[in-house]
Amino acid sequence: MKGRVRIRGIYATALTSIFSSLSYEIVQQSVEISERFMQEINNLSADITIKDFEDDRGKIIVMGNGIIEDDLRNVFKYSFHWRSPVKLYSVIEIDESCTYANFKVEPCLREGIVIKPPYDGKIILSETKAVSKYAIVWRGKGITTFSEHIVDEEEKMRLLTLSLPLNRKGYNVKWRSNAKYVALNELKEDLERLILRYENREFRDQGEDFYLITLSLPDKLYLDEVRKNVVDTVKYHHMLKLSYNREVDSLEKDKKGSLGKLLEGLISDFLKIEHIKADGKVIYLRGGKVIEKEVNDNGYRIVLRREFEGNGILDGIGKKIEEGDYDIVEYNSDKWYQIHKYYSGIDNSLKGVYINISTPPELLRGKIRYLDLEIDIAIRDSEIALLDEDELNKKSIYMPSSLVNKAKEVVNYLINRIQQNKLS
């Protein structure tokens, strides 16, 4: 058996099924999950937590110790994977430039504990503390605090029997959620180890791995299929859950409503475009007016007209953008690319074609989202140009090999279609 995993959030049913099959031990299940899998709740402490990312439920956080990275890359084959170069709760020393491993650090402490890894380019620190999977200890006012997941008053009193004596000696103690699943004698020994670590400044081995996975539409569809083996699940369940809640439940449980209508309800007259880079950076492209749409229970096809002001150069095409120029682009839930056709606002002549290679686009309320696969194709004056191949190689550290191979496969397919004059 591999590590113990606690799973929370909208992907919990599918991920419980998957990680159970990979020989991880599932612990601290919700009542709903235990009933769905006909299991008793396994009240043991967790080594690993998998949950939705609070800032964006289209992403998953995996944190703790004991996860096998290859398992993540084999499960989420077509998603972006970011592993923090600095461990959560590790203690680091900061130089005068207030940076660490080329990341900006806030606040600029000489030494501190990492409380937020740099998934947005910045490390957030707090004062140095000793951390285990059960508790956090540091010198302070001598108080005890509790994880938000410890709410039972009897449980708090149980834990206070251990932390109050330390409070009287000037130590702060914060109990983590795992503590409520562990016997007092084990917790007492853990606190003693934390005190020694804190006083001896032995933080070298402290810290937890932290992964942030940006899910693609194909991987969400895979999770839909896994969930379907456990409970009634419609196609696009996990995508729709980012915009709807009760409507999806009603469709699945009560068979009320239409999947096609839910999908169509996400399409406004004007759609924003969320273009996600492999390193996690999000670029909001100029949105567009919906001029065509086809939607049914199996998928969607949306055509946008994006209009430009007279400023800049068309990327990859090299022609000046003039007032009134516009782009006609199709987003298709089945396609790993979008063909941008740029036209002159003066005489409607075609200026060039730019093909963006990406995961199939998701529909969220009022916007389209996809993962950009870095490599692109431009057609200018009948010449084919392969763009940013070096970027794909450089950013492949964030991609499973299956995703890199898919990007190359799509490029080869498109070049072949262009050469045969069959591009569509």
UniProtKB/Swiss-Prot annotation:
GO terms for biological process: rRNA processing. It comes from Saccharolobus solfataricus (strain ATCC 35092 / DSM 1617 / JCM 11322 / P2) (Sulfolobus solfataricus). Keywords: Endonuclease, Hydrolase, Nuclease, RNA-binding, rRNA processing. Pfam families: DUF402 (PF04167). Probable RNase involved in rRNA stability through maturation and/or degradation of precursor rRNAs. Binds to RNA in loop regions with AU-rich sequences. Its EC number is 3.1.26.-. This is Probable ribonuclease FAU-1. Belongs to the FAU-1 family. It comes from the Archaea. One of its GO terms (molecular function) is RNA endonuclease activity, producing 5'-phosphomonoesters. HAMAP family: RNA_binding_AU_1.
